[in-house]
Structure formats: C-alpha cells, structure tokens
Amino acid sequence: MTNIRKTHPLLKIVNHSLIDLPAPSNISAWWNFGSLLGLCLMIQILTGLFLAMHYTSDTLTAFSSVTHICRDVNYGWLIRYLHANGASMFFICLYMHVGRGIYYGSYTYLETWNIGIILLFAVMATAFMGYVLPWGQMSFWGATVITNLLSASPYIGTTLVEWIWGGFSVDKATLTRFFAFHFILPFIIAALVMVHLLFLHETGSNNPSGIPSDSDKIPFHPYYTIKDALGFLVLILLLLLLVLFSPDLLGDPDNYTPANPLNTPPHIKPEWYFLFAYAILRSIPNKLGGVLALVMSILVLAIIPLLHMSKQRSMMFRPISQVLFWILVADLLTLTWIGGQPVEHPFITIGQVASILYFSIILIFMPLASLIENKILKW
C-alpha cells in the first residue's frame, strides 16, 4: 500500500512541498531565511490576533488600550513586545533573504522574484499601518508625514490624501481603517507566500554555485527540516533576548507620549527598518522627486534581472561584483544611520552621496562589473 502522504489530496501537497521535495545538496544557511520568514509571519499573525482582542481602534482609547494590554492583560506585555520586536526580526530576515537573492542570482526566477517584490511592498505597508495603531506621537506624525507624500501626485494629490485620511487630517477614520487594513493584510501576505512557493517549486531552489543542481538532489526531509528547525531555535532565542531584556531598544521614546496634533516631535522618523528609504526620500529637495526616489529604492529590485549581464548566475566566483555587493550593503547601513539623524550639515550631504551611490551600484556599476568579469573569463 502506498503511503497516505503520497495519495491523500491535501497531504500530497504538503508532501511535495516539505517532505519529498528534491532540494540541492549544497544550499547554505542563507537559504534558511525563507522558512524563518514563514515563522515570523505565523508569530505576527498569532500575537496580532491576541492583541486585536484587547485593542480599540478609537483615537480616544487606542493609546489607553495598549497601556491596558501591557499592564492588565495576562502576559499582555509579552504579546505586545513579541509583536513589536517580531516585526524587527521579520525585516532582518526579509533584507537577508533579498540580499541572498541578489548575491546568488536567484532573481533569474522571474515569477518568484516579482511575487517577492510584491510581498516586500505588502509587508512594508502592513508594518507602517501597524506603527500607527498605538496612537503615540510618532504614530500620529509618522502617519501624517507618510500619507502626505501622496499629495505630491499631480492634480489628484490633495483629493487622494483626504480620501485616504477619511477627513481633513489624520483622525479617527484614519485609525479605524488602518486597523482594518493591518488586520487583513497578513492573510493576503500568507496567500501571496503560497503563490511565491508555487512558482519556486516550478523551478526548484537555486544554490550557492548558481549551477543547475538537478544531478545532485536530496529530500527536503530530514535534511532541511532539521536545518530549518535549528534556524527557528536561533530566531526565537534572539527574539526572546530582545523582548525580555531590552524590548524598547528599537522603538522610539516619543511613542510613549499620546498623540497630540498640536505638538510636533523634534525629529519625525519611522522605525529603523524604513530609515534607509526615508533617507533616500529626504535627500531629494523636491517633494515629487523624493517620493519617486522612495518608491524606486524598492522597485529597483524589479530591474535587477534585466541588468544581469554576467555569464555566471551567482556572485560566488565573481570578485568584482562581490566587492560592489558589500559596498552596497555598507551603503544601505549608512543610509539607515542617516535616516535617523536630523536634517542638517553634514548629514544632508552624506545622505545625498549615499543615495546616489545606492542607485549607481545597482544600475551602473554592477552590470559594468559583470561585463568586465565576462572579459576576464576569456583571459
């Protein structure tokens, strides 16, 4: 008799995705981040569900309800900080996952890559709306500043912003709809993840060498299930260290002050994981230009497959591209630092140089390096 996991209509899908899936024998720890992102999403949905049971999306009570969760609900403080810091872990894994894709040329799987970009946008939108919900100072002013960027759209800008606000400023209507969207989006993300995996399993995983691994496959279970389990342990350990020892390390103290439309905080800045994009936005003195640069900072990922000039898929054996890649990583860290600094000399200049360098590396230097490396192959 054939094993039920191979015949049952539902178990068959699980079997082909997680058990009998043929996987390359040489994928490194950089391939762990996909499953870690799945774990992060599950943690966020679960903790978010329990938070939603006690949260009220009303301007008068939102801040108090979050305080109530932390003080009066059993382990409410744990759920709240797991959710807040879980978002940070989510973005760390996201950026590592995207970085791995760029380094090892995984972007040549076009459908998987493009769904991944849509997922990145969806997660960023969810995180932004989630940050508004506690209704602290940074929640309110962050929402005001970021939604206001849409007013840069020609002709329809102002109408568009007021339509999103549900009024003439960020108020009760805005908070209520942000809560609704923040609740529904993770489930849309989960559905997109299924599509992401569907496309990935059409081609199979890439591997560090970038060479097709059809001749040497191993079953996903037990080899990569145990490897993923180790990744889960490390992620949970790091998350708990953060939550139990310094839960407010990555947050903004201003968000412990209830939202006040009459008092603007001295430095309006988003959570750390958006600072690189925020720095790019601020480095352009024109509003529309800044918004376009902000969108392009992520959308540029969609252009990367078109700029792949190399005869090799992975950067494993391409030293010039490797150097450029790590300069890009350093540049993103620089942008993250600049995004958290006030708009004054010398930070303005550093931000502008880092922004130009970011786009130059991706759009100009990396394709050029690939062409040079192609020439070197013939020497």
UniProtKB/Swiss-Prot annotation:
It is found in: Mitochondrion inner membrane. Heme b b566 binds at H97, H196. It comes from the Eukaryota. One of its GO terms (molecular function) is ubiquinol-cytochrome-c reductase activity. Its cofactor is heme b. The gene is MT-CYB. Heme b b562 binds at H83, H182. SUPFAM superfamilies: a domain/subunit of cytochrome bc1 complex (Ubiquinol-cytochrome c reductase), Transmembrane di-heme cytochromes. Belongs to the cytochrome b family. The cytochrome bc1 complex contains 11 subunits: 3 respiratory subunits (MT-CYB, CYC1 and UQCRFS1), 2 core proteins (UQCRC1 and UQCRC2) and 6 low-molecular weight proteins (UQCRH/QCR6, UQCRB/QCR7, UQCRQ/QCR8, UQCR10/QCR9, UQCR11/QCR10 and a cleavage product of UQCRFS1). This cytochrome bc1 complex then forms a dimer. Binds 2 heme b groups non-covalently. A ubiquinone binds at H201. This is Cytochrome b. Component of the ubiquinol-cytochrome c reductase complex (complex III or cytochrome b-c1 complex) that is part of the mitochondrial respiratory chain. The b-c1 complex mediates electron transfer from ubiquinol to cytochrome c. Contributes to the generation of a proton gradient across the mitochondrial membrane that is then used for ATP synthesis. Heme 1 (or BL or b562) is low-potential and absorbs at about 562 nm, and heme 2 (or BH or b566) is high-potential and absorbs at about 566 nm. It is a multi-pass membrane protein. One of its GO terms (biological process) is mitochondrial electron transport, ubiquinol to cytochrome c. The chain crosses the membrane at residues 33-53, 77-98, 113-133, 178-198, 226-246, 288-308, 320-340, 347-367. Pfam families: Cytochrom_B_C, Cytochrome_B.
